[in-house]
């Protein structure tokens, strides 16, 4: 298993896409399992077979989504309607969790003040 925790976070957009393609090539050739942690929704969809969304505090798995997009993938997949549907679904899930956290933080702030 190869565990990667936001390895492309500090890269510019073009370099990030080159490295994503390189990771897909390495994965395809090696057959290794890759656990890839990212905050970038489109990166998760592009690279993954499954995307796991964590919930608000305490961190728990909110949902696991199977990404049913053809392989091999190239950057053109990001314009596919199915890709965009996954992106919308993930944004909605994450937005729900952000709102929960904001409400919890506001309640704690109000209690402490």
Region roles according to the model:
Residues 2-6:
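Catalytic Walker B motif of ABC-type/P-loop ATPase nucleotide-binding domains
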Residues 54-89:
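Conserved beta-strand-loop-alpha-helix hinge in the C-terminal portion
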Residues 9-11:
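ABC ATPase nucleotide-binding domain "signature" loop
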Residues 23, 40-42:
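The feature captures the ABC ATPase H-loop/switch
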Residues 44-46:
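A short, surface-exposed alpha-helical micro-motif characterized by mixed small hydrophobic
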Residues 16-31:
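Helical segment within the ABC ATPase nucleotide-binding domain
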Residues 50:
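Short, glycine/charged-rich "phosphate-handling" switch motifs in NTP-dependent
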Residues 31-37:
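Conserved H-loop
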